[in-house]
């Protein structure tokens, strides 16, 4: 996928313009995956909010930070309904047709990993 499409997708969903000469290397909501050219989504986690790691993200080379929490920082783009927009953005960004994606939920105390493995194997065999 060309970089121009990625830039347009970000502008379409978040209203942010990234100069075309800035290469987007990855998108992440995990500080462990931030590198030069990353877009970091600062979201609510289990014990903290991604906005707590803005300085770290910038130090690691993030070119854009999109946060679900209002932050007084010019480098952070606030999107109050980030969770509602994010899924549509990811489908668009990775050029995935939503109708082709299937989700399965596996719950219970025991056997989840085995069932997930078997379900994956069956769906892969069915594609052939």
Describe the role of every protein-language-model region.
Residues 1-88, 92:
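N-terminal leader/targeting and accessory segments in enzymes
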Residues 8-11, 85-128:
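Phosphate-binding loop of NTP-binding sites
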């Amino acid at each position: 996928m060309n970089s121009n499409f990625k830039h347009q997708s970000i502008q379409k969903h978040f209203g942010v313009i990234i100069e075309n000469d800035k290469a987007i290397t990855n998108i992440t909501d995990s500080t462990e995956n931030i590198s030069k050219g990353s877009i970091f989504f600062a979201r609510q986690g289990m014990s903290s909010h991604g906005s707590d790691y803005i300085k770290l993200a910038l130090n690691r080379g993030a070119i854009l930070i999109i946060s679900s929490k209002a932050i007084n920082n010019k480098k952070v783009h606030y999107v109050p309904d980030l969770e509602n927009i994010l899924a549509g953005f990811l489908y668009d960004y990775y050029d995935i047709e939503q109708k082709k994606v299937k989700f399965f939920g596996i719950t219970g105390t025991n056997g989840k990993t085995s069932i997930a493995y078997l379900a994956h194997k069956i769906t892969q065999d069915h594609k052939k």
